[in-house]
């Protein structure tokens, strides 16, 4: 295993157990079997390695969601299952739960709201493609599909910019909005 991968493996282990705030670079380096100075040959900061770990973990968990959910079921049921699955997988994951931690949230939100982050986010790309294909198959006009995807982009924007500190119960509120939006479209 190369040194960068050893750092990532050690960081994943430590962040998974302790969370972001309680983890130090010295502990990651020690667990990887290298000096702290060597850490900086591969990552410029704790934030940088955490972002790398977070992206990998988010992709892994979201891929599991893609594989586990039935994307052909009734849209209202699908939205409900999508939110429930996301809550279940994120709430018990110390790495993904850091999305709401003010100490690192800005870094994570900044990455995922950037064009690079959107393009490199396979779950986001999957949702856009899957919902677009489904709407096309159901006979929605290109204009209606664009309008609906614009609302999806608003939900994505809210996820990137509104935290629980800004708006208590934001996740539940977004779920209610999404569910009722879909109900309105299907009428």
What are these regions (language model features)?
Residues 52, 56, 66-92, 149:
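Hydrophobic alpha-helical connector segments
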Residues 6, 10, 14-48, 52:
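Helix-turn-helix
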Residues 62, 108-139, 143-147:
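Amphipathic alpha-helical packing segments from all-alpha helical-bundle domains
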